[in-house]
Amino acid sequence: MVNFGKKLMADQVEEWKGYYINYKLMKKMLKQYVQQTQLGGKDREQVLKEFSRILDEQIERIVLFLLQQQGHLANRIEELGEQRAALLEQHDISQVFQLREAYREVGRDLIKLLRFVDMNATGIRKILKKFDKRFGYRFTDYYVTTRANHPYSQLQQVFKQVGIVAVVGALSRNLAYLQDHEGSVLSIYDHPSVTLKDPIIDQVNHAVQKLTHATSFLQFLGQHALIIQEDVQSGSEDLVDDQSYHFMSLILNLVNTFLYMVNTYIIVPTADDYAVSLGAAATVCGVIIGSMAVAQVFSSVYFSAWSNRSYFRPLVFSSIMLFAGNLLYALAYDLNSLTVLLIGRLLCGLGSARAVNRRYISDCVPLKIRLQASAGFVSASALGMACGPALAGLLQTRFKIYSLTFDQSTLPGWVMCIAWLVYLLWLWISFKEPGHFAKSSDTAQPAESGHQVNANLEEGLAQPLLTGSEEGQDQNAEDNDDNEEESKNSHGPATSISSAYKLLTPSVKVQLLIYFMLKYAMEILLSESSVITTYYFNWSTSAVAIFLAILGCTVLPVNAIVGSYITNLFEDRQILVASEIMVLIGIIMSFRYTPHYSVPQYVLSALITFVFAEVLEGVNLSLLSRVMSSRLARGTYNGGLLSTEAGTLARVVADATITAAGYLGPDLLLNITLLPPLVICIASLVATFCTYNTLY
């Protein structure tokens, strides 16, 4: 990947050259300050003040130029508006086309200005991170706190561009008035549902969204998948060839995601009854549910590595393992063996191909629909989470065929066996391997067919993200200076767990802790629900299934509200803190304080915990995708794998907690299992406040 120094020089507008952040100067100043502090020439307080002053001057120059350019664009739009008013009275169609092209020219200049701001905002972030890294001092915290919250903040002008958005609105409105719509003119304010079909406006909106992190429901939902985008310019060419994209293969990945989530949650309402029928305690349901997560800890790594070579074979292997695992799960009752049941669940966990599903979307889906695919991944997961318990509630019957028993405990296994067998056949017939895998397969096995496409994705991904002309000696010196900190290898993906861990900044670690906490709290709530509700309220399996299905059905509506409205009113970090506090309140409400534990208390506390954990997950992954290194966008040890491992470990620990607490008796189970998530939630809140300003 091209480093930022080269990228800045290659992409800057020549006539605006003197107004960009002087990235080279800032890096040299950092180097000098490091040497001076090591020699004892300056103390850190002096360095902090001097560097702050220099950065203030850089930002002031950027902001004043930005305001000047906004004024020029506003004047041009005003002049064109006067022409538009005159032309609409004359009804001269030819002049209308010329005027529309003039507006589009303003749009092109606006895109240049948006990229100017984006490049400078990126430069400021990188310089702040470099300072923290070089000095081991949280300069970002100090600088953001003192500058961003000041009433005369210039930093806000760079990161919160109200003026630019106003220019975008004026441009969109005027182009809409000129758009022919059944013989009348349009107003974007009177007809907000009408889409303005103009490529310039599409490009402008894309640039604004990239710059401001503006969020729609689709974007918010897509960020749940944590499919990290590499740091490319908004106008960059998509490296995934449209011809190499195969829609049915994407659908098969999403169906795999859906079925796996159904497979995970379909046993939750009946796991305690199954354990009792095999002679174990009801709380062994924690081990039964958690054994799948234990295996997933390991399967996520080897599936992620396997996806470097193929997507088809891992999905086939996944289907076979899940078929075999569910078969053993279903047969365990007639074999009267808890061991067989646990082996079956372990095999199901070893078939978890979610890392492959994420990787396929990241690497093999064109950029223009990758957001929709990511949202589809999350929607499939949410739908599976809701359908699993609901399906279990429908399987309340009992009959025998020969010596095989079919009841509420074994039917989930039999149903999923059939589902995975059908999926395997569909996969074998319809899946097409991406081009670079198919070509290598052709070389080794010419007879193999049915899994090919034409584009060479591997070569495309290997190309530099930005290219430019050869730079002069000064630029080479700057690049060499970059390489003192970041070797050529440092631009590639992480190649080991240790190298991935080194890329985790304090902000990323805190977000992973929050992710661990919310998954822990949700797993405790879901996995022990059948035991708790049976002990305190004498609920039937159907009642538990309905309750869990209702919880699962809240996922998409909650994300719709947060993604469409809440994130447009508040910053992500503000929603993060508020959600953590609400999860904490939900956990505190869940404790049994009196001998009588009521249904309203349990249901209300469960809803608060689950709903706000869902809100927290979306915002957490949104922030995580923003603060995580772009080096974790690809490769085996990618950001999606790290988040999956954190969440899976949380589930393992939570399920183990339920089983261990079960030995103390059902009366103490609820309060004992709620103590760890309470402590972790408080710790994550403290950690969030400590890194709050780095989430800017």
From Swiss-Prot:
Cellular compartment(s): Membrane
SUPFAM superfamilies: MFS general substrate transporter
Single GO term (MF): transmembrane transporter activity
Cellular component per GO, a single term: membrane
Keyword Membrane in annotation: yes
Pfam families: MFS_1 (PF07690), SPX (PF03105)
Main location: membrane
Keyword Transmembrane (UniProt): yes
Domain SPX: 2-145
Keywords: Membrane, Transmembrane, Transmembrane helix
Membrane-crossing residue ranges in chain numbering: 247-267, 278-298, 315-335, 338-357, 375-395, 411-431, 512-532, 543-563, 575-595, 603-623, 669-689
Biased amino acid composition, Acidic residues: 471-485
Positions of region (Disordered): 470-494
Membrane topology qualifier: Multi-pass membrane protein
PANTHER family hit by this protein: INNER MEMBRANE TRANSPORT PROTEIN YAJR, SPX DOMAIN-CONTAINING MEMBRANE PROTEIN OS04G0573000
Recorded family membership: Belongs to the major facilitator superfamily.
Protein name: SPX domain-containing membrane protein OsI_17046
Organism: Oryza sativa subsp. indica
Organism placement in taxonomy: Eukaryota, Viridiplantae, Streptophyta, Embryophyta, Tracheophyta
